[in-house]
């Protein structure tokens, strides 16, 4: 056998199909780069692992003829030779680019690592000669030539990225990273195109333009060739420019960017920029202001539009403006899961997409077909939008991170998540390879043998039949997981319950959950499966408890949230012996846990941060502890720690348990609203007292410090969301103030920092001179200030002043002195009364958020908390100087004293007290249920139903809840008009 025949056989073994052409190309390459044509070069062994050896050899022969030196530099190194051979076998279009631009072979030689986002952007801006003009980046070269340079630079970066991609031993392992870098490249292209657009627009500096990436680009999971979905938001760059002018300018810029990215020239093209996802689609304006966007999404947007916004990301232009847009729409995105018809609409949309696939393409659609990429994406997005309302870990843009988060949160089984992730990675690699070949936008499997064989080799297979089999198996696996999660999953019912007659089929369990009042039966089944699968002791206890737990959870306002929380707490504590024993043996504990979990996100937040707090539920006596008992416990744990931070941490741990105890008593209706306010006041005072003692240990000769409680703390009326308003007072003496300030500063920092328990915020803004005044004052300083300079509003604020914490002698001395200020002997002058009324009116107009119905504002609305409190206080300021019975910090006690003295009649008293108590209960209930403070009654009917049921009003009583509040307020408002406003 001659050497030529030997080379041909070797090439055939490496996978070439046309041996004559391959042999001829081999000889052309060898002759041009000075190699031996009678034997295979070392680099040629890499043909075995490339997608199309014939194509690779053909392009290499062209390069050898025209750019032998450049090619030789690549082939001299095994790693770069491997990258080049694989690249040329995978992409005929990038091969043609390298023939025309051999200098870009340097991208194959370079170290195959991902470039940073800023590196790519800076490189592309340099390509167009961009520079800063004020705050804007503007290209410095003519648009035409610069546009072509940008197109060529895009190809250069694609050569670099694709070289890294195809040289990976397993491309599915880096697909996430490659897709993210392609999105970075898109950001850079659009950024450079915008710089070019600004160069052609003389008045560009009058408009801020944010370009928002949507779809795969927004999620940073972009393809090689894909439409880049965008939206445009604009604002005037300065006050002299109108919104309309800014939109006009920004529209020119946006259109120019789209043209540059989409246009074809001798240098090729980049990709289409598609703004069809914008409000009103192609029928709507290309660019909108932030206000216009907000109006559209608040009033007219459809559910699917919020699903699309899940992937919104600022990509170019004014990134701050873009981020503001994303933050503006984000709350709406995470509310759409509650929208009427959202789930059936999402399912119908997916079904419709599949039905529209052309018959000839069925079975070949990698993206849209049954079992394709879209099934994985829609599965993840549906679960994200349904459960992401309360679980922020699900608020991610990309599919793979979403699947990871869903599995971690228990919303999808780990096995299903792994199957979906594995399939998604493989299908994305397939999609990338069919696009890479000619750099054309396609999502179809090849329908020819050569194309299928090329794709097979790209994913580690050999033949067309193999890739067909893998595609079929993968799409079927996706369909199975998608069907279980997205539609109606069939899960073993309540697992293997020891009592035979409690064993149910999956459908029976689903029906039971629905009958009990659970809304998301599929999620419920997943949680039950997670808690009752296996053979461990913990599982046996959970399995025995599950039927009762489901019934107790269903009795609560939010069964679905309760079941999820029960799973989270159980997974955190399931192996703890005391928890298992309590679940099994303490029926009251299990029932209380169910009620708490299904009622209160606030309680769940405390529990999930510190699951051991659940031990509180074992205690039958939930009567709030006295301040003295709290102080003893806190001081005892603090003394066990020499380190001050550890001591305060231990104090806060006690507070966390006692706060949860108060919450439980509230949720179970063991304690009324006034007792809750007192309990929270005592807990806050004891916490601050113990922490002050601990922090003072650190300062030598620490001076006594008194803390005067103000506001709701001083009135013994704290709510769950209240800060601790206060004043800090020390005795007179040299150096006392400096030491006291050091102690107070550390005290506020240690109690105010975020931790497993809610922070205690010590707010001293009511101090003399407010924030501009000293944090700590001596007794004498307070006397001078209140004796000479205090304002009427400060006299009013002092009506709430009482001992809060620290040295009681100091606080008592200060309180005794300010009695003359807050209880003026002659009452209020006419001007003082007018001043108070004017301040009240201004607060109402300034502090009620725009767009909020004042009637739904619990604090500042007509007949709300502020109206009633100020009415009581104006009576105190007028008459407490000569009527000691009015000298109280409590609103209700002040109203009681006013009734006894005849300043209000029984009807007025009842209306004011009823409204104040009802509003206080409702404000606490909102915090308990939603886990976040709000002075506004929610407009969401789902939340209102939960709050109503948590308030003891029954299921579906949201309308009654609002009507009850409005009725109380109307009655109280009439009294306020008569007493406070004298109308």
From Swiss-Prot:
Keyword tRNA processing: no
Names of the cofactor(s): Mg(2+)
Residue runs in coiled coils: none
Annotated region (Adenylyl removase), positions in chain: 1-490
One BP annotation, GO: regulation of glutamine family amino acid metabolic process
Keywords (A to Z) from UniProt: ATP-binding, Magnesium, Multifunctional enzyme, Nucleotide-binding, Nucleotidyltransferase, Transferase
InterPro entries recorded: GlnE (IPR023057), GlnE_rpt_dom (IPR005190), NT_sf (IPR043519), PII_UdlTrfase/GS_AdlTrfase (IPR013546)
GO CC list: cytosol
Entry EC number(s): 2.7.7.89, 2.7.7.42
GO molecular function, one term: [glutamine synthetase]-adenylyl-L-tyrosine phosphorylase activity
Reactions catalysed according to its record: [glutamine synthetase]-O(4)-(5'-adenylyl)-L-tyrosine + phosphate = [glutamine synthetase]-L-tyrosine + ADP; [glutamine synthetase]-L-tyrosine + ATP = [glutamine synthetase]-O(4)-(5'-adenylyl)-L-tyrosine + diphosphate
Region (Adenylyl transferase): 496-983
Tagged with keyword Magnesium: yes
PANTHER family: BIFUNCTIONAL GLUTAMINE SYNTHETASE ADENYLYLTRANSFERASE_ADENYLYL-REMOVING ENZYME, GLUTAMINE SYNTHETASE ADENYLYLTRANSFERASE
Biological role stated in the UniProt entry: Involved in the regulation of glutamine synthetase GlnA, a key enzyme in the process to assimilate ammonia. When cellular nitrogen levels are high, the C-terminal adenylyl transferase (AT) inactivates GlnA by covalent transfer of an adenylyl group from ATP to specific tyrosine residue of GlnA, thus reducing its activity. Conversely, when nitrogen levels are low, the N-terminal adenylyl removase (AR) activates GlnA by removing the adenylyl group by phosphorolysis, increasing its activity.
Matches recorded under HAMAP family: GlnE
Homology family: Belongs to the GlnE family.
Protein name, per record: Bifunctional glutamine synthetase adenylyltransferase/adenylyl-removing enzyme
Organism: Cutibacterium acnes (strain DSM 16379 / KPA171202)
């Amino acid at each position: 056998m001659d050497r030529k025949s030997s080379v041909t056989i070797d090439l055939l073994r490496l996978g070439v199909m046309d041996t004559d052409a391959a042999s001829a190309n081999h000889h052309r390459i060898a002759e041009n780069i000075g190699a031996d044509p009678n034997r295979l070069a070392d680099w040629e062994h890499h043909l075995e692992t490339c997608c199309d050896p014939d194509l690779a050899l053909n392009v290499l022969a062209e390069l050898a003829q025209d750019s032998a030196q450049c090619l030789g530099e690549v082939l001299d190194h095994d790693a770069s030779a491997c990258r080049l051979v694989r690249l040329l076998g995978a992409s005929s279009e990038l091969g043609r680019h390298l023939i025309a631009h051999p200098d870009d072979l340097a991208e194959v030689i370079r170290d195959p690592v991902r470039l940073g986002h800023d590196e790519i952007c800076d490189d592309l801006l340099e390509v167009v000669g961009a520079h800063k003009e004020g705050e804007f980046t503007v290209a410095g070269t003519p648009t035409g030539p610069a546009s072509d340079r940008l197109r060529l630079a895009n190809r250069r970066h694609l050569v670099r990225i694709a070289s890294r991609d195809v040289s990976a031993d397993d491309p599915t392992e880096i697909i996430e990273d490659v897709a993210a870098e392609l999105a970075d490249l898109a950001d850079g292209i659009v950024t450079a195109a915008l710089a070019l657009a600004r160069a052609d627009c003389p008045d560009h500096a009058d408009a801020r333009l944010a370009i928002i990436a949507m779809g795969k680009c927004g999620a940073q999971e972009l393809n090689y060739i894909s439409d880049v979905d965008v939206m445009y938001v604009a604002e005037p760059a300065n006050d002299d420019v109108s919104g309309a002018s800014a939109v006009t300018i920004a529209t020119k810029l946006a259109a120019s960017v789209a043209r540059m990215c989409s246009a074809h020239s001798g240098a090729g093209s980049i990709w289409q920029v598609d703004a069809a996802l914008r409000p009103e689609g192609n029928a709507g304006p290309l660019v909108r202001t932030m206000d216009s966007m907000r109006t559209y999404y608040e009033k007219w947007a459809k559910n699917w539009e919020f699903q699309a916004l899940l992937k919104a990301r600022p990509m170019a232009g004014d990134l701050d403006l873009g981020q503001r847009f994303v933050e503006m729409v984000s709350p709406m995105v995470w509310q759409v899961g509650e929208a009427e018809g959202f789930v059936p609409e999402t399912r119908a949309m997916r079904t419709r997409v599949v039905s529209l696939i052309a018959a000839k393409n069925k079975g070949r659609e990698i993206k849209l077909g049954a079992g394709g990429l879209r099934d994985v994406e829609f599965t993840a997005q549906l679960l994200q939008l349904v459960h992401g309302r309360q679980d922020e870990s699900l608020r991610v843009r990309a599919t793979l991170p979403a699947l990871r988060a869903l599995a971690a949160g228990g919303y999808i089984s780990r096995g299903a998540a792994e199957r979906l992730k594995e399939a998604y990675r493989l299908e994305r690699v397939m999609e990338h390879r069919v696009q890479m070949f000619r750099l054309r936008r396609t999502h179809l499997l090849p329908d020819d043998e050569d194309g299928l064989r090329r794709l097979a080799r790209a994913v580690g297979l050999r033949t067309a039949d193999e890739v067909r089999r893998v595609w079929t198996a993968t799409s079927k696996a996706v369909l199975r997981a998608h069907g279980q999660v997205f539609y109606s999953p069939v899960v073993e019912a309540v697992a293997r319950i020891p009592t035979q007659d409690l064993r149910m089929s999956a459908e029976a369990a689903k029906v039971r959950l629905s009958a009990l009042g659970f809304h998301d039966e599929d999620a419920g089944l997943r949680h039950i499966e997670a808690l009752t699968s296996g053979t461990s002791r913990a599982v046996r206890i959970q399995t025995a408890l599950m039927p009762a737990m489901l019934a107790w959870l269903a009795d609560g306002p939010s069964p679905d949230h309760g079941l999820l929380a029960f799973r989270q707490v159980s997974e955190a504590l399931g192996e703890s012996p005391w928890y298992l024993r309590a679940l099994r043996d303490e029926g009251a504990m299990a029932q209380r846990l169910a009620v708490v979990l299904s009622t209160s996100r606030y309680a769940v937040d405390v529990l999930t941060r510190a699951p051991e707090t659940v031990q509180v539920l074992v205690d039958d006596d939930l009567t709030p502890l006295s301040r003295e008992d709290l102080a003893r416990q806190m001081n005892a744990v603090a003394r066990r720690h020499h380190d001050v931070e550890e001591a305060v941490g231990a104090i806060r741990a006690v507070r966390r348990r006692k706060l949860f105890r108060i919450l439980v008593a509230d949720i179970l209706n063991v304690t009324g609203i006034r007792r809750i306010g007192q309990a929270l006041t005592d807990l806050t005072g004891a916490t601050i007292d113990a922490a002050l003692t601990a922090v003072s240990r650190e300062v030598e000769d620490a001076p006594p410090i008194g803390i005067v409680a103000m506001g709701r703390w001083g009135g013994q009326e704290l709510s769950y969301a209240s800060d601790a308003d206060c004043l800090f007072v020390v005795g007179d003496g040299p150096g006392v103030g400096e030491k006291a300030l050091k102690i107070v500063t550390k005290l506020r920092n240690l109690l105010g920092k975020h931790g497993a328990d809610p922070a205690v915020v010590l707010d001293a803004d009511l101090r003399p001179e407010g924030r501009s005044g000293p944090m700590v004052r001596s007794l004498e300083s307070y006397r001078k200030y209140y004796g000479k300079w205090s304002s009427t509003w400060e006299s009013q604020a002092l009506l709430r002043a009482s001992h809060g914490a620290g040295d009681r002698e100091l606080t008592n001395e200060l309180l005794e002195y300010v009695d003359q200020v807050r209880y003026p002997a002659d009452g209020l002058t006419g001007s003082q009364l007018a001043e108070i009324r004017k301040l009240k009116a201004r607060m109402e107009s300034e502090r009620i958020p725009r767009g909020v119905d004042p009637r739904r504002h619990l604090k500042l609305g007509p007949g709300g908390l502020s109206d009633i409190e100020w009415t009581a206080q104006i009576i105190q300021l007028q008459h407490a100087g000569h009527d000691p019975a009015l000298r109280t910090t409590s609103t209700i006690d002040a109203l009681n004293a006013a009734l006894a003295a005849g300043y209000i009649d029984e009807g007025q008293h009842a209306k004011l007290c009823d409204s104040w108590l009802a509003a206080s209960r409702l404000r606490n209930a909102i915090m308990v249920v939603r886990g976040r403070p709000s002075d506004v009654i929610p407009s969401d009917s789902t939340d209102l139903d939960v709050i109503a049921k948590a308030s003891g009003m029954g299921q579906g009583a949201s309308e009654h809840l609002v009507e009850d509040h409005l009725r109380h307020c109307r009655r109280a408002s009439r009294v306020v008009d008569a007493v406070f406003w004298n109308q």
